[in-house]
Curated annotation (Swiss-Prot):
The keyword ATP-binding does not apply. Residues 1027-1045, 1052-1074, 1270-1284, 1347-1376, 1402-1433 have a biased composition (Basic and acidic residues). One of its GO terms (biological process) is axoneme assembly. The keyword Transferase does not apply. This is Dynein axonemal assembly factor 1 homolog. InterPro entries: Cilia_flagella_integrity, Leu-rich_rpt, Leu-rich_rpt_4, LRR_dom_sf. Residues 189-227 form the LRRCT domain. PANTHER family: LEUCINE-RICH REPEAT-CONTAINING PROTEIN 46 (PTHR45973:SF9), PROTEIN PHOSPHATASE 1 REGULATORY SUBUNIT SDS22-RELATED (PTHR45973). It is found in: Cell projection, Cilium. One of its GO terms (molecular function) is dynein complex binding. LRR repeats lie at residues 38-60, 61-82, 83-104, 105-126, 129-150, 154-175. Its main location: other.
Length: 1501
């Protein structure tokens, strides 16, 4: 359901409106707001089509204003809205942010979908509480357009999406916005250009909570900060930490729920809590267990962790992390110890992880030493097993013995004694095992020694664990004796073991180069007390082992020295290679820092190690020895330094290198400066010496004079060529001396290179040129090494004697300033006069002058193209300029104005014909036609000058002669008329055509020519006879037949004219009577003028190549004139003797009018042929009879006093015109004189033919005076008028057909298509209606009527074709004038002609049996080609005319009033309804068939 104001609202939206007080109140009423403006706090003005903001001063309490989707281009008139908080201006045409100083409470501003290129005027000083800014879909591009955001300290929401921002420096702007929380940048190129876009913006904006389409969570910010600190690895760890925290939080919430449930459940039914390795408690337990395990391993001599670091294995290997994977594995250390002991006992089965393979694969190598060691180890193992078994047996015996003892005495010390005894018994073989192992492994490499040491620690740990299991052993008496001593030994041993472990750990964590050092080197020698054993055998073995250990230690020291020497050699080679690499690359290696983390190279993973340079293999290649195994290459650390230290070392080397280069450059610059100082001192000395010598002489004056001359020329040229900014029209050249046409080619007295020495050069260029000239002159002659004072004096005297010295020295600054002022004043007057004159004559210029890019350009009127101005005139000499100063400024107005040689189109002002000047017209016409004959290879059109001036005698006659006629030529050339002026072009063409005929009237009794004109006419006639004889010699049979037909017409025309001269006085009286009578010749406004051409002109026009249709038209015109003459004889006979004189008068009048119309028709068709014929012959005609009562077409109406000579539109190309008019003045004048002579000869021939024609006309008029026939007494006099009406229509149609035949040359295809589908036009059958009037003539004129009807039928066919062409070519807009003319003729025919023919035809007459129908049938049989164009049944003609229907009764009453009683009218006008279907396109473009009923008057005959 529509709102009441919906219609009004729709009207407001349709167009652009303005905000008015009434409109605002209507909107408030529609939106149910207050009618009092100050009571409203919101106002909805969106989608209203407003152009500007206005009339809102009374709405002072507004807090929200909606102005979106309008056409607002400027923010204005908001000064009174001081409480405004929200302003919505999206979808408008705003280009600048301004005029918001008074809206200090503005919180939200929406300017999206506008044309803003820069953010401005919204800082905190202007809008202190601005919180939200939406400026999407604008034209923001870089950081400069966003720089004003730094001043918005309170802005928290910023939407910049869908702009054109591509500058990554905007991040710096966002960093300086302290309150920015929401930022939208999507849709800008910078999003893809900014690396790590989201992390970068999160780090830049500390308060950012929402970026683009996603929020910024604390987790995102924490990950971004971790990424900034530690790279991607730190970000990964941070993500894991947040994931654990989230899982812990979820688990705690679930456990709290479980605890709440378990409170109300029995213990056996309670649900266990969720546990995970990620919980902090479990992590703490794992970490504490790991710490305890490491502490125990340190105490008991385990070095697994240290070995992991040395071997490159990760600390998360199985053997070190099995206890950390779950809490259950960390319950007890005993089970793990048992597992290790078992694996130690079965080492041969599978080697332990982290141990070197050499310990287990020695037998595979087949080495004798390894086999010996394996055998020795086997024996030692057997001995250890035997000792263990003995100890177990001793334990059993001890247990039995203890049972027999007094339990009370030993109860207090059972466990301690057992432990001490176990230590004494078990420690001895362990020590021996250690010694044996060390003695056998002295010859092994450093790595193997370390492995063995770690293996020994494993044995110690295993034995220690076994001792802890012995809890049930009770001390015996012997053991109790040594209890105190054993405790002391135990303490000492533990201390020594801890020290050994500490020292060994330090050795293992040292550098790679110190790996060869014996880990037991710093071990203290065991004390005698510690090493003392009870067994003598063991004691001896211990001593032996001890001795071997000492030897091994000494040998190890020697090996260490050798290793250090070797290390030094390697360091030298490494340094040499590094130097070579630095010299080759001169850059820091790309992979110095190892996986992006600053850690020792020994902690790098295998992949990182593989990516480094294989220094070990390089070392091997340098030393010439084979490389070690692959695992050493991958696991051995590459450098002893961390990556940071390595980078610092490399940077320091580069700094030293750069410092050396910088020092070298500084030295080089110092040397160059010293050389420059030396050269400068030498040059200054030379210059000083030269200046002294110049001052001594007087040559300075000569140089100064030359420079002053050049400077004055340059300054004057700069002034004269000043740009057009200072003056409205710029430097327009003088029309008095210079034109835009080509200058005459004259030989210049001064060579071009000397004509203007300072042309186009600035002051600096002139000075440089003078310096080059001076230097070249000095270089031509080698300077003498020394100049004596005598030579200087001679040179000074020679300079003083120079002639130009006095002239140069007389100039003073004051005189030069006065000269410059005079030149400036003269230039201003020159420019002002030229500009004023040009502006005063601006109507004559086709083109306009406009300032484009600080230059004055010529803008073409028809095409709009820009062209450069012609070159300005040369500099005016001082003598000429002084004369111009004395002349009056108005003297420029007398200059002859000339036009540019550009294509022209008619102005939009109405065309006004000029008064005819007969002599000039004839001279120019003859000249143009002779020229056209000479240029027969060009297009077959002629040109004629518009007689604008009396004479063309001036110094620049050729330019004037060409330019004055260019406008008239363009008006006549239809090819150059643009499609925008089609109607105007058609009107201009018709006017020109009628002006031509008005100028060449041929019906007056005598030619009112002057003596000069008669002479020229005689010359033109003589030349015309020559041309006619030449033309007849080249005719073919077809042309001869046409000439015969035309000769017959000429004979009849001569008879008519002879008779017309005798009855001229009676004709004048008849005209007066006809003007006062009820039936007039005048057809009212819109009809054509009746004009007649002489037979001579028609004969001369005929072209051998003319079309057949044109010949038929001419033959029809001649034969219809014959028919008109014979019908006039019948009129005379019908009147009888008493009415003979009147019949003669009326018959003569009808004959003359018919002849006029047929001649006019022939002229139109002949002229149409002239437009297309390849050759042109002169057309010389007579003045037409201007009938004041003759109706004229409204397209050719003009004052009868104005007559202008107009010729056929020319087609001569502009290049040929230019070549003809501008080749030379003398040649032009010579051709003019020749053309004048030819014109005089042609005029004389025409005058002779004119006299003969009048004589023949008098004889013909005398022959046509017999008495009328009584059979035709009942035919009224209006018959002659009716006969005259048909040629009138034919003449108009011929004229328009001529135009229509050429309209397709300048109409676009769309207009032609519209014209083809046009519905209205002239009827093709109206000529047949007129033909029927000729069928009732008497049988006496049957022979003459047959020939007339034959040609008339051919004319009708040709007219049908012409009408068809006209309908197909004319545009509906262009045919409005044609339609009016056609309707006027048809209305006249309907009202007069048709009804009057009804009175002529008798009731009992049989139309189909007349001689005319018989002739038509016979002609149709003879000519089957033309039969197709005629109706099948010629006896029933039906013609449809488009007209405004009038009542048939009225026309019948009028005809009955004038009808004689003897004649009964036949009802031939009927109004019938006709139904037919039309295919019509609807609005959607679909074809719809509609049934249409039309009522029309149909004439049946």
């Amino acid at each position: 359901m529509c709102e009441p104001g919906f219609a009004r609202r729709r009207e407001e939206v349709t167009g652009l409106n303005r905000i008015t007080e009434k409109g605002l109140k209507d909107i408030c009423k529609r939106d149910k707001l207050y009618q009092t403006p100050r009571l409203n706090d919101v106002l909805y003005l969106h989608f209203q089509g407003y152009q500007c903001i206005e009339n809102l001063d009374e709405y002072t309490e507004l807090k929200s204003l909606w102005l979106e989707s309008n056409a607002i281009s400027e923010i204005q008139n908001l000064t009174k809205l001081t409480k405004l908080k929200c302003l919505y201006l999206q979808n408008n045409l705003i280009t600048k942010m301004e005029n918001l100083e008074f809206n200090r409470e503005l919180d939200t501003l929406n300017l999206s979908q506008n044309h803003i290129r820069k953010i401005e005027n919204i800082g905190t000083d202007i809008l202190p509480v601005l919180n939200t800014l939406n400026i999407t879909s604008n034209y923001l591009t870089d950081s400069a357009s966003l720089a004003a955001l730094v001043e918005c300290k309170t802005l928290s929401v910023l939407d910049l999406s869908n702009n054109r921002i591509d500058d990554i420096l905007i991040v710096k702007i966002f960093e300086q916005m302290p309150s920015l929380k929401v930022l939208v940048l999507q849709g800008n190129p910078v999003v893809s250009r900014l690396p790590q876009y989201r992390k970068t913006l999160i780090l830049a904006c500390k308060e950012l909570t929402y970026l683009d389409s996603r929020p910024v969570f604390p987790r995102d910010r924490a990950c971004a900060e971790a990424w900034k600190r530690e790279g991607y690895e730190g970000e990964r760890k941070e993500v894991q930490r947040w994931n654990r925290a989230e899982r812990r939080k979820t688990r705690e919430s679930v456990n709290s729920t479980i605890r709440m449930r378990n409170r109300h459940l029995k213990p056996e039914n309670q649900v266990p809590l969720l546990t995970s390795s990620d919980s902090e408690e479990e992590q703490k337990g794992i970490s504490s267990a790991e710490k305890a395990q490491k502490r125990a391993e340190m105490e008991y001599g385990s070095v697994d962790t240290m070995w992991d670091e040395v071997s490159g294995e990760s600390q998360a290997s199985e053997h070190s992390t099995t206890s950390s994977t779950s809490a259950e594995d960390n319950e007890s250390a005993g089970s793990q110890a048992d597992h290790i002991a078992e694996r130690i006992s079965n080492r041969r089965v599978k080697p332990l992880e982290g141990r070197p393979k050499v310990l287990y694969d020695e037998a595979a190598s087949g080495d004798v030493d390894s086999i010996v060691k394996l055998v020795t180890n086997k024996e030692e193992n057997e001995q250890k097993d035997q000792n263990i078994s003995e100890i177990e047996e001793q334990h059993k015996g001890k247990i039995v013995f203890i049972e027999e003892m007094n339990e009370n005495q030993n109860a207090s010390m059972g466990n301690q004694k057992a432990v001490s005894e176990a230590v004494e018994t078990i420690g001895k073989p362990v020590a021996v095992d250690v010694n044996n192992t060390l003695s056998n492994s002295i010859v092994e490499p450093v790595n193997e020694q370390n492995n063995l040491a770690s293996d020994q620690m494993e044995h110690l740990k295993g034995k220690r664990i076994l001792i802890e299991k012995v809890d049930d052993i009770d001390p015996i008496k012997k053991e109790l004796k040594y209890f105190d001593e054993a405790m002391q030994n135990k303490e000492l041993k533990q201390t020594s073991e801890l020290e050994e472990l500490r020292d060994f750990t330090e050795n293992l964590s040292s550098d790679v180069q110190e790996q060869a050092k014996d880990p037991s080197e710093s071990d203290e020698e065991p004390t005698e007390e510690e090493m003392e054993v009870k067994s003598q055998l063991l004691k001896e073995q211990f001593q032996d082992r001890k001795q071997r250990l000492k030897e091994a230690i000494e040998e190890r020291k020697t090996m260490q020295k050798n290793l250090e020497a070797r290390k030094e050699d390697l360091n030298k080679s490494y340094n040499l290679f590094a130097k070579i690499m630095d010299d080759a690359t001169d850059n820091v290696p790309k992979r110095v820092f190892g996986a992006g983390c600053d850690m020792p190279s020994k902690d790098w993973d295998k992949e990182e190690c593989m990516q480094q340079l294989p220094l070990t293999s390089m070392e091997d290649s340098i030393n010439g020895r084979p490389s070690s195994n692959d695992e050493d290459i991958l696991t051995r650390p590459l450098t002893e330094l961390t990556s940071a230290e390595a980078a610092e070392e490399i940077c320091s080397q580069l700094d030293r290198k750069l410092a050396g280069e910088e020092a070298a450059l500084r030295q080089l610059l110092c040397d160059l400066e010293n050389e420059n100082e030396i050269l400068y001192s030498i040059e200054t000395q030379i210059k000083y010496a030269e200046s002294i010598s110049v001052e001594d002489s007087q040559s300075q004056m000569v140089c100064a004079s030359l420079l002053n001359d050049l400077i004055s020329d340059v300054i004057y040229k700069d002034i004269t060529e000043m740009g057009p900014n200072s003056y409205p029209l710029g430097p327009i050249e003088s029309d008095e001396e210079y034109t835009y046409s080509e200058e005459p080619k004259l030989e210049k007295m001064v060579p071009p290179h000397l004509e203007n020495p300072a042309g186009g050069k600035s002051l600096r260029e002139c000075v440089d040129t003078f310096k080059e000239f001076f230097a070249s002159k000095g270089n031509d002659k080698p300077r003498q090494e020394s100049h004596t004072h005598l030579e200087k004096i001679r040179a000074a005297k020679a300079l003083l004697k120079s002639k130009s010295l006095a002239e140069f020295s007389k100039d003073t600054p004051e005189s030069l300033d006065a000269q410059l002022a005079k030149d400036e004043d003269r230039r201003k007057r020159h420019v002002a006069a030229s500009a004023g004159r040009c502006f005063a004559k601006r109507e004559k210029y086709d083109d306009t002058l406009e300032v484009v890019d600080n230059r004055l350009m010529v803008v073409k009127k028809d095409t709009g193209e820009l062209e450069e101005l012609p070159p300005p005139p040369e500099l005016i000499s001082d003598s000429e300029s002084e004369k111009e100063v004395e002349e009056d400024d108005d003297a420029y107005d007398t200059a002859e104005e000339t036009l540019q040689e550009y294509p022209r189109v008619p102005w939009t002002t109405p065309y006004k014909p000029k008064p005819r000047k007969a002599a000039e017209h004839l001279v120019n016409e003859a000249m143009q036609r002779i020229l056209a004959e000479q240029f027969s290879e060009l297009p077959d059109d002629t040109k004629e000058n518009e007689p604008q001036e009396d004479e063309f005698f001036s110094l620049e006659a050729k330019e004037t002669f060409g330019n004055l006629d260019s406008e008239f030529f363009q008006k006549l050339d239809l090819d150059k008329v643009t499609t925008a002026n089609n109607a105007e072009a058609a009107t201009e063409c018709m006017r020109s055509y009628n002006e031509l005929k008005a100028c060449m009237k041929s019906g007056s009794t005598e030619l009112q020519l002057t003596s000069e004109e008669n002479e020229m006419l005689q010359e033109m006639l003589s030349s015309n006879e020559d041309l006619e004889a030449k033309h007849k010699s080249n005719d073919d049979p077809l042309v001869e037949r046409d000439n015969e037909l035309l000769n017959k017409m000429m004979q009849r025309m001569k008879e008519h004219e002879e008779r017309a001269r005798e009855l001229q006085e009676q004709l004048e009286k008849e005209k007066e009577e006809e003007n006062s009578g009820p039936i007039k010749l005048s057809m009212g406004e819109g009809s054509m003028l009746y004009q007649r051409w002489s037979p001579l002109s028609l004969t001369e026009i005929i072209d051998p190549q003319a079309e057949e249709g044109g010949r038929q038209a001419e033959e029809g015109g001649a034969q219809q004139e014959e028919g008109g003459a014979q019908s006039e004889e019948r009129d005379d006979q019908a009147e009888g003797v008493p009415q003979a004189e009147e019949g003669v008068t009326q018959g003569e009048e009808s004959v003359l009018q018919e002849e006029e119309t047929h001649a006019e028709n022939g002229v139109a068709q002949a002229e149409g042929r002239v437009l297309q014929s390849p050759e042109i012959y002169p057309i010389i005609g007579y003045e037409d009879i201007d009938d004041d009562d003759a109706a004229s077409d409204f397209t050719t109406d003009y004052s009868s006093d104005d007559e202008v000579a107009v010729v056929v539109p020319p087609k001569i190309s502009p290049a040929m015109l230019k070549a003809y008019y501008y080749d030379g003045f003398e040649e032009d004048m010579r051709m003019v004189r020749e053309n004048e002579a030819r014109t005089r000869r042609g005029l004389r021939a025409i005058m002779q033919k004119e006299k003969q024609m009048w004589k023949d006309n008098e004889e013909m008029a005398a022959d046509m005076a017999p008495s009328p026939s009584p059979k035709e007494e009942h035919i009224p006099e209006v018959k002659t008028e009716t006969e005259t009406a048909k040629p009138t229509v034919e003449t108009a149609k011929d004229k328009w057909a001529k135009i229509a035949s050429r309209l397709n040359e300048f109409l676009d295809p769309e207009a032609m298509e519209q014209l083809e589908s046009h519905e209205f036009g002239e009827s093709d059958g109206e000529d047949d209606v007129d033909l029927t009037g000729l069928q009732n003539y008497d049988e006496e004129s049957e022979t003459e009527c047959e020939s007339a009807l034959k040609e008339t039928a051919e004319i009708g066919d040709s007219e049908k074709q012409e009408n068809k062409t006209q309908d197909e070519t004319l545009d509906p807009k262009d045919t409005e004038a044609i339609t009016d003319v056609t309707l006027g003729i048809q209305r006249l025919k309907r009202q007069k002609l048709i009804c009057q023919w009804e009175k002529i035809i008798p009731e009992d007459s049989k139309i189909g049996d007349g001689p005319t129908e018989k002739f038509l049938d016979q002609k149709a049989q003879d000519n089957p080609e033309t039969t197709d164009e005629r109706p099948e049944n010629p006896k029933n003609f039906i013609t449809l005319d488009y007209f405004v229907d009038t009542e048939p009764s009225e026309s019948l009453e009028d005809t009955e009033a004038t009808e004689t009683p003897e004649v009964s009218t036949e009802q031939t006008l009927k109004t019938e309804q006709m139904e037919f279907n039309l295919d019509v396109l609807n609005d959607d473009g679909d074809v719809v068939i509609k049934e249409v009923t039309v009522e029309a008057q149909v004439t049946y005959q």
